[in-house]
């Protein structure tokens, strides 16, 4: 029989055991919970039953936290050469129970047990065991984010205590896992080496992939929730860029497209304030690569929020995008086709940046954009370049209010009428560049109607 049945028939006996030896009884309850949860059972039912039993045996959440935290502190070695525990109740199991318990508590209860957690966090910050620090970071993140809903977090001393514990554990996790966080190889071969000095069991070892996923989904968003200082955010961002982004982007020579988890890291970093210096080079190098628009539609959608974040934080960079648009060939050493596609790509980059932005985000640069569009149309461009201008105008109609685009219409409408009139007299051949131009004009006309 598993936990629910044991609770029904043995509550009185457990209460007597709890009174005689709290520590051993707690170990037995947690061990029973862990064995049941690892079997093919209803996990949520087992979790709820365990927490209900603990609440029945104890008078407060503080007692549960104190007992489990004491058990963790007694097991955690101060260095990698510490004694290996042979009990099933390893530190990860105890941390998982506390994390489960913390998710069920409200902000008021979290405020009551935070002093206990604060003491545990300081103890964990002195160990060099990667998986212990990792689980301590997860628990601190869960409790810290919940604590923001309580009045206690508004007190400067408590807020600083939460922030310091959170940042310290985050930095320690990154430094202890170090280069094993490189996910570019697509395997977790480094995970055993991280823990080999202590000989942890497979259930104790946390793979670098799991660490990176936790950093993206839980830890990085918490920097904003916990109102961490920008200099500390920048420091953590720089570390993640060094250990994850740099090797990941260097290793994409085969398929060129970054791995999905690398995208997740980059997108998470772009959502943090004042961190663009740590990740902008990876975004810009990809964006200005000639292969950028050869990607799939899904990849283009994934890059959109990152491009938007970069140009939102550094709006002056749009001038660089506009400046790369040439009205005529200026390089004698490139082929006609290469020059043509380079000019088309430059215009499309402008369209892409504007499309990923918010409405009227680049009003200050609109006169410069208008000047460039007029110069292109007056230079009698190739049909593909000409067609790209009308795609760009459709994007402008989506991202600028109509009153800001009045300066474009005299030359745009004149060219559209001319092209349609010419097509009526001389129908373009199938699959020709001229047909592509007519199609682009027709789509803009349809959009205007």
What kind of region is each of these model predictions?
Residues 1-108, 115-153, 157-360, 367-383, ...:
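Alpha-helical solenoid cores of large eukaryotic proteins
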């Amino acid at each position: 029989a598993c936990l629910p049945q044991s609770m029904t028939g043995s509550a009185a006996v457990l209460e007597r055991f709890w009174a005689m030896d709290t520590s051993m009884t707690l170990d037995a309850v947690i061990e029973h919970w862990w064995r049941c949860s690892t079997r093919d059972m209803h996990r949520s039912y087992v979790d709820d039953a365990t927490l209900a039993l603990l609440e029945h045996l104890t008078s407060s959440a503080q007692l549960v936290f104190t007992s489990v935290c004491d058990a963790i502190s007694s097991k955690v070695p101060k260095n990698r050469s510490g004694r290996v525990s042979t009990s099933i109740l390893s530190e990860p199991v105890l941390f998982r129970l506390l994390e489960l318990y913390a998710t069920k508590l409200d902000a008021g209860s979290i405020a009551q047990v935070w002093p206990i957690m604060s003491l545990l966090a300081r103890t964990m910050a002195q160990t060099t065991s990667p998986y212990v620090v990792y689980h301590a970071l997860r628990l601190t993140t869960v409790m810290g984010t919940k604590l923001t809903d309580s009045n206690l977090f508004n007190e400067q001393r408590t807020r600083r205590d939460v922030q310091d514990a959170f940042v310290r554990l985050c930095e320690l996790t990154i430094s202890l896992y170090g280069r094993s966080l490189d996910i570019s190889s697509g395997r977790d071969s480094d995970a055993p080496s991280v823990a080999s000095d202590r000989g942890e069991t497979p259930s104790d070892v946390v793979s670098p992939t799991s660490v990176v996923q936790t950093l993206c989904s839980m830890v990085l968003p918490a920097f904003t929730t916990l109102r961490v200082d920008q200099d500390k955010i920048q420091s953590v961002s720089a570390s993640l860029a060094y250990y994850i982004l740099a090797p990941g982007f260097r290793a994409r020579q085969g398929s060129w497209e970054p791995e999905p988890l690398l995208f997740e890291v980059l997108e998470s970093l772009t959502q943090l304030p004042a961190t663009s210096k740590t990740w902008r080079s990876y975004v810009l190098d990809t964006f200005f690569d000639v292969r950028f628009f050869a990607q799939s539609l899904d990849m283009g959608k994934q890059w959109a929020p990152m491009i938007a974040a970069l140009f939102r934080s550094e709006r002056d960079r749009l001038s660089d995008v506009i400046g790369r648009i040439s009205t005529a060939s200026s390089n004698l050493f490139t082929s006609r086709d290469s020059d043509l596609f380079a000019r088309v790509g430059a215009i499309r980059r402008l369209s892409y940046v504007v499309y990923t932005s918010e409405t009227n985000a680049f009003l200050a640069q609109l006169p410069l954009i208008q000047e460039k569009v007029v110069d292109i149309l007056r230079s009698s461009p190739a049909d593909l370049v000409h067609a790209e201008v009308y795609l760009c105008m459709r994007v402008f109609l989506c991202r600028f209010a109509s009153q800001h685009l009045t300066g474009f219409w005299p030359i745009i409408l004149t060219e559209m009428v001319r092209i349609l009139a010419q097509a009526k007299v001389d129908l373009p051949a199938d699959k020709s560049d001229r047909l592509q131009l007519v199609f682009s004009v027709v789509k803009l006309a349809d959009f205007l109607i």
